[in-house]
């Protein structure tokens, strides 16, 4: 019993669970329910992220669909950032901050508040890693928004955005950057971000097949 209590009161465990719960806050679901009386999990792809929110509202002819989708995107991004910010604020080790980031991503994708359903997690991914690998993340965010704006294919923008940040961690850590944001110096491996990218590919498997078949829908 004592070992269980020690485990549950361990600050690393507490912050990992907290990260999962913060990431699990279903902003897209809540806003759609409150303002439009719609259950986003039963519309379109069933995802709770900005893309499905946009498509659902546009299909109903809602005039502020883009503004609401943008709000969902920002909130999903900031909840990941906030979870990692708390772990930094309380002095958790850099490698454990990555655990909190991953927990927040899993929380979004498998929300405990929605029977472990959720979204694909890209906004939360970008938010959670921006304080850990800021240079790579900001470039990845730029690619994400640029591809999304020009090609209007959300899934491709998401994959390329996270993919860009992942590729850059094999180059940026060798530059003259602070150790506090150098994954290679602090963790000794790029594995956490690589795993996040693999997870992104898995969550977008259906979209990838559609892209290859030329059937992926655009976001208008």
UniProtKB/Swiss-Prot annotation:
Q: How does it sit in the membrane?
A: Multi-pass membrane protein
- Protein keywords: Cell inner membrane, Cell membrane, Lipid biosynthesis, Lipid metabolism, Membrane, Phospholipid biosynthesis, Phospholipid metabolism, Transferase, Transmembrane, Transmembrane helix
One Pfam family cited in the UniProt record for this chain: G3P_acyltransf
GO terms, molecular function: acyl-phosphate glycerol-3-phosphate acyltransferase activity
Top EC class of this enzyme: transferase
Sequence intervals crossing the membrane: 11-31, 70-90, 96-116, 127-147, 153-173, 193-213
Major localisation = membrane
UniProt xrefs under PANTHER family: GLYCEROL-3-PHOSPHATE ACYLTRANSFERASE-RELATED, INNER MEMBRANE PROTEIN YGIH
Q: Which family is annotated?
A: Belongs to the PlsY family.
Q: What does this protein do?
A: Catalyzes the transfer of an acyl group from acyl-phosphate (acyl-PO(4)) to glycerol-3-phosphate (G3P) to form lysophosphatidic acid (LPA). This enzyme utilizes acyl-phosphate as fatty acyl donor, but not acyl-CoA or acyl-ACP.
Name of this protein = Glycerol-3-phosphate acyltransferase
What gene name is given for the protein in this entry?
Answer: plsY
